[in-house]
């Protein structure tokens, strides 16, 4: 049993390696190109995964087209994008690691309380990466940087769910 615990810690440690300055720059610059599209980002997530939309009481059971242009939708989309923007802005600087860990840990705790699953976080990731890859200059280097950033984030979030 101890072996598996150590193995799990080694895997998480290997996954959760900080972004280099170059990787952080790729994530930050690509995010900057789309972060003003809050409503479109959240709409893309909901369109791809209606089960995620169903987790939001104010949007559950409603047609996406009927809520996309509402103030409530824009407000929530801005909250999500602002959170991502804050974490992304802190990335690439090792002295910010504890701040990122605190923010992302709270994200996991908050979403556990709402019954969000690791699978739904995976769906969010898939939808976000699909959105990014269709709206920014997306090459292997950008994809690798985003995958590393998301791996790091999910290594903190998923165990808390």
UniProtKB/Swiss-Prot annotation:
Residue ranges occupied by any Globin domain in the UniProt entry: 18-161
Domain of life where this protein originates: Eukaryota
GO cellular component entries: extracellular region; hemoglobin complex
GO terms for MF: heme binding; metal ion binding; oxygen binding; oxygen carrier activity
Family annotation (InterPro entries): Erythrocruorin, Globin, Globin-like_sf, Globin/Proto, Mb-like_M
Keywords linked to the UniProt accession: Heme, Iron, Metal-binding, Oxygen transport, Signal, Transport
Extent of the signal sequence: 1-16
Positions with a binding annotation for heme b: 76, 111
Entry keyword Signal: yes
Miscellaneous: There are at least 12 different components in Midge globin.
Family, as annotated: Belongs to the globin family.
Assembly behavior: Homodimer.
The protein's name in its UniProt record: Globin CTT-VIIB-3
The species this protein was found in: Chironomus thummi thummi
Gene designation per UniProt: CTT-7B3
């Amino acid at each position: 049993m101890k072996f598996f615990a150590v193995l799990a810690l080694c895997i998480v440690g290997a996954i959760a390696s900080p972004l280099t300055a170059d990787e952080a720059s790729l994530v930050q610059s690509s995010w900057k190109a789309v972060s003003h599209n809050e409503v479109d980002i959240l709409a893309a997530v909901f369109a791809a995964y209606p089960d995620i939309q169903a987790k939001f009481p104010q949007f559950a059971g409603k047609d996406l087209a009927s809520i996309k242009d509402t103030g409530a939708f824009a407000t929530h989309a801005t909250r999500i994008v602002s959170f991502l923007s804050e974490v992304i802005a802190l990335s690439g600087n090792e002295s910010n690691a504890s701040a990122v860990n605190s923010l992302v840990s709270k994200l996991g705790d908050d979403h556990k309380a709402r019954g969000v699953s690791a699978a739904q976080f995976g769906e969010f990731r898939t939808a976000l990466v699909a959105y990014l890859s269709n709206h920014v200059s997306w090459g292997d280097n950008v994809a690798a940087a985003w995958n590393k950033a998301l791996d790091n984030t999910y290594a903190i979030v998923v165990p808390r769910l």
